[in-house]
């Protein structure tokens, strides 16, 4: 028994179906923006640039496939993830399939850093992190030049 949950779709829809009339949805559009980020150590990126570039190209191809063939992409998701087709159809519109690096990522991690300091998870005497020193868009720019929407040093 729980008082509240916060989950990604399609599991929110599944919880609603299981909970019936006892479940209430608190709508908070754009309260949270879900991203999936690719991370690599700098030494790995330098040594494996070709491999990382291939991964980025494969993701871009997958995004193009999803956009060109949404019904088939949904069928694959249903088959491979075992999710009910009605659930997939109901949550599909909230997803944005894109290979990109956006200003919002930097804004989000900066906000998380401020929260961590404010809540005492980070010692106050530590300097603010320089996130731009840890973000490298060079390989993504080679694969998809328009995928990065802000200027990096």
Regions picked out by a protein language model, each given a short descriptive name:
Residues 1-80:
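Pocket-lining segment of extracytoplasmic ligand-binding domains
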Residues 10, 28, 91, 105, ...:
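Residue-level "edge-of-site" marker
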Residues 15, 33-34, 95-96, 133-138:
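Short secondary-structure boundary/hinge segments and terminal tails
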Residues 26-29, 43-48, 107-111, 140-150:
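Short, structured secondary-structure boundary patches
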Residues 27, 41, 102, 132-136:
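Helix N-cap / beta->alpha transition motif
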Residues 34, 40, 93, 127-128:
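Glycine-rich, flexible loop/turn motifs
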Residues 46-125:
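Secondary-structure end/capping motifs
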Residues 117-153:
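Conserved C-terminal helix/tail region of periplasmic/extracytoplasmic solute-binding proteins
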């Amino acid at each position: 028994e729980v008082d509240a949950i916060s989950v990604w779709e399609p599991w929110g829809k599944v919880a609603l179906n299981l909970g019936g009339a006892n479940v209430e949805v608190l709508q908070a559009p754009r309260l949270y923006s879900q991203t999936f980020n690719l991370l690599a150590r700098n030494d790995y990126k330098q040594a494996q640039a070709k491999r990382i570039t291939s991964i980025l190209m494969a993701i871009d191809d997958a995004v193009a496939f999803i956009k060109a063939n949404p019904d088939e992409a949904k069928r694959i998701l249903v088959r491979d993830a075992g999710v009910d087709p009605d659930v997939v159809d109901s949550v599909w519109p909230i997803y944005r399939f894109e290979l990109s690096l956006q200003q919002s990522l930097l804004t989000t991690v900066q906000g998380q850093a401020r929260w961590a300091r404010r809540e005492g998870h980070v010692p106050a005497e530590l300097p603010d992190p320089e996130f731009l020193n840890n973000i490298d868009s060079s390989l993504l720019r080679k694969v998809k030049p328009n995928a990065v929407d802000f200027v990096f040093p």
